[in-house]
From Swiss-Prot:
Annotated GO CC locations: host cell plasma membrane; membrane; virion membrane
Intravirion side: 1-9
Residues linked to a glycan: N61, N70, N86, N146, N200, N234
Cellular compartment(s): Virion membrane; Host apical cell membrane
Function: Catalyzes the removal of terminal sialic acid residues from viral and cellular glycoconjugates. Cleaves off the terminal sialic acids on the glycosylated HA during virus budding to facilitate virus release. Additionally helps virus spread through the circulation by further removing sialic acids from the cell surface. These cleavages prevent self-aggregation and ensure the efficient spread of the progeny virus from cell to cell. Otherwise, infection would be limited to one round of replication.
Record-linked SUPFAM superfamilies: Sialidases
Stated name of the protein: Neuraminidase
Entry text on domains: Intact N-terminus is essential for virion morphogenesis. Possesses two apical sorting signals, one in the ectodomain, which is likely to be a glycan, and the other in the transmembrane domain. The transmembrane domain also plays a role in lipid raft association.
Signal peptide: none
Keyword field: Calcium, Disulfide bond, Glycoprotein, Glycosidase, Host cell membrane, Host membrane, Hydrolase, Membrane, Metal-binding, Signal-anchor, Transmembrane, Transmembrane helix, Virion
Taxonomic path: Viruses, Riboviria, Orthornavirae, Negarnaviricota, Polyploviricotina
Post-translational modification: N-glycosylated.
HAMAP family: INFV_NRAM (MF_04071)
Keyword Protease: no
Length: 469
């Protein structure tokens, strides 16, 4: 090969390499531009149209780093849409309950600014659990805490914090309320907030931080709601509300709410005689509630809600080991599934239970007459067999010589099943502890477990002699 041929060959090879490099740079440029614009668009599987990502509610942003010939390209993948919760998974099989959370609010109030509260509850969005309570518009170490034993004042507000975070001064006040319920439909929070005069109260429905709807008192006698979480299935949330006598016939309605708007109202039907302060849980495809009969029964009413056709049925828990306080002793108490037992039916306390096949798990105060101690157990046949009394898997949550209070249920969706959890209100102060002028609470929370567990007692634990008066 002569010199001219060598020059031509080298030139041809160089030109070929340069052309390849040029084409590669064009490809990189096209890829970069394409990815840059595609991060703001998602393919719609329904009609193959392009939809903007920005207005869509998302669960998370995912960023992938792609390396091409020393060029770094950031590609944002469009996140999946957030869907309504449907709670269609089965209920978890459990052997009992394990400790989950305790906020120690009263003990912390001895040396810090903590809200005075009562009527606490717990509810979870798809990723995190929150604790709620009705604040009294004051901290404990504050003269405004005097006489906070009263339930209904215009200063009461619904407080919301992450579970385990006491209600400190930075706590969000969600709404004005002396009775409330909250739940998350998979996209946003719904808060039902009742406030106003006893004879003409208003319930406000706040969805995604906005007031969407309201309803006024229909019986002019203390409109009130659950004091625990409501339940949403496929975008329809249900809440049980009562207006009328606390010791006689009252008017209970079940409201169906979609994104904060009341879409239907159903009257209570079935054999339940008096229904208040329901503890509700998803029982796909419907909702089931265990409530308080403050008139005739120490056995707890059951309210079954059909979300699809808005129909309602009601009855009573079959277990002869009844769940309300006050009640007869276990040898004398009874329940026959359909009607109130007419045993120490006046007064009562908010509580919970849930079905497990033919059996029932339940919690109650250990004392038959006062809000002292707390226990849980399973009653074999307690859901289906009248007056069943075979108790197993009993656990003490709070010893009998320590104070308890309201309790309620909340549900947590896992990978394969829905777990049931409960909270116990630990009331301190007046009326029983007259050294101080305030009434407030802390909480303890347990969740169902399929594992083993030990024993203990988890009272409030504050020394009343160390507390502000």
């Amino acid at each position: 090969m002569n010199p001219n041929q060598k020059i031509i060959t080298i030139g041809s090879v160089s030109l070929t390499i340069a052309t390849i490099c040029f084409l590669m740079q064009i490809a990189i440029l096209v890829t970069t531009v394409t990815l840059h614009f595609k991060q703001y668009e998602c393919d719609s599987p329904a009609n193959n149209q392009v939809m903007p990502c920005e207005p869509i509610i998302i669960e998370r942003n995912i960023t992938e780093i792609v390396y091409l010939t020393n060029t770094t390209i950031e590609k944002e993948i469009c996140p999946k849409l957030v869907e309504y919760r449907n709670w269609s998974k089965p209920q978890c099989k459990i052997t009992g309950f394990a400790p989950f959370s305790k906020d120690n609010s009263i003990r912390l109030s001895a040396g810090g600014d903590i809200w005075v509260t009562r009527e606490p509850y717990v509810s979870c969005d798809p990723g995190k659990c929150y604790q709620f309570a009705l604040g009294q518009g004051t901290t404990l170490d504050n003269k405004h805490s005097n006489d906070t034993i009263h339930d209904r004042t215009p200063h009461r507000t619904l407080l919301m914090n992450e579970l385990g975070v006491p209600f400190h001064l930075g706590t969000r006040q969600v709404c004005i309320a002396w009775s409330s319920s909250s739940c998350h439909d998979g996209k946003a929070w719904l808060h039902v907030c009742v406030t106003g005069y006893d004879k003409n109260a208003t319930a406000s429905f706040i969805y995604d931080g906005r007031l969407v709807d309201s309803i006024g008192s229909w019986s002019q006698n203390i409109l009130r709601t659950q004091e625990s979480e409501c339940v949403c299935i496929n975008g329809t949330c249900t809440v049980v509300m009562t207006d009328g006598s606390a010791s006689g016939r009252a008017d209970t309605k079940i409201l169906f709410i979609e994104e904060g708007k009341i879409v239907h109202t159903s009257p209570l039907s079935g054999s339940a005689q008096h229904v208040e302060e329901c503890s509700c849980y998803p029982r796909y495809p419907g909702v089931r509630c265990i409530c308080r009969d403050n008139w005739k029964g120490s056995n707890r009413p059951v309210v079954d809600i059909n979300v699809k056709d808005y129909s309602i049925d009601s009855s009573y828990v079959c277990s002869g080991l009844v769940g309300d306080t006050p009640r007869k002793n276990d040898r004398s108490s009874s329940s026959y599934c359909r009607n109130p037992n007419n045993e120490k039916g006046t007064h009562g306390v908010k509580g919970w239970a849930f079905d497990d096949g033919n059996d029932v798990w339940m919690g109650r105060t250990i004392s038959e007459d006062s809000r002292s101690g707390y226990e849980t157990f399973k009653v074999i046949g307690g859901w289906s067999t009248p007056n069943s009394k075979l108790q197993i898997n009993r656990q003490v949550i709070v010893d009998s010589n320590d104070r308890s209070g309201y309790s309620g249920i909340f549900s947590v969706e896992g990978k394969s099943c829905i777990n049931r959890c409960f909270y116990v209100e630990l009331i301190r102060g007046r009326e029983q502890e007259t050294r101080v002028w305030w009434t407030s609470n802390s909480i303890v929370v347990f969740c169902g477990t399929s594992g083993t567990y030990g024993t203990g007692s988890w009272p409030d634990g504050a020394d009343i002699n160390l507390m502000p008066i």
